[in-house]
Amino acid sequence: LGIENQQKVHYAMPLRHMVGDAFSYLKEYNELAVQNKKQKNWRNSDEFLSGLTAEDRLHPMITICIYYGEKEWDGPRSLIDMLKVPERFQALVSDYKMNLIEVRNSEYLKFQNSDVSIVFDISRFIYDKRYDKINDIYKEQLIPSELGLVIGAITESQKLIDDAIKLEKEGGKMNMCKALEELEEKGRI
C-alpha cells in the first residue's frame, strides 16, 4: 500500500502513481527472477526467458492519493486525462487510474477508525465553513490534541496548531467547538 499526501493539486499525479507502482512491480519481478535463476526453476524456455514460472504472481500495488487542499481537485484522475489522444485511438491506449481521496469531498467515506473520521469530518466542515455542523456533531466532545494538530495542519490554521501543541504539552484534549468559536470571532478561519 502506498499513500501520497497532497496539499496542492499535482497535475502529473496519475503518471507519478503509475511510475511508482511500476518500480514496485519491477523490484518484485527482479527478486523473483533472481530466485528462480538460483533455484533453476525453469521447466521450459518460456519460463527461462521471462524469469518467471507460469505460476509466479506479483503482489498487487495499491497507491492512494489523499488530497487535503482547500480547493477542489481539478487535475487528471487517470493517465488518459493527461494525454492528447485522437478519439479513434483512445481504445488502444493503456490507461492508468489514480485512487484519489479528497478530504473536502469525503462525506461518502466510512472509516473504521473514529480518529480518521473526526479528522476528515472537521477538516471538511472547516473548508465548507460549516461551523454549525461541527458544533452539532462535536458539541462538548473532547478530542485528542494530536487530532487537533492534524486538523490544523490540513486546514492551515496556525491557531489550531498552536492550541493543540499547548494542550499536548499539558497532556490535555481539545474542545473543537470552543477552538473554532475563537477562530471565527477573530476571522482567522
Question: Could you tell me what each predicted segment is?
Answer:
Residues 1-189:
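Elongated, amphipathic alpha-helical interaction scaffolds
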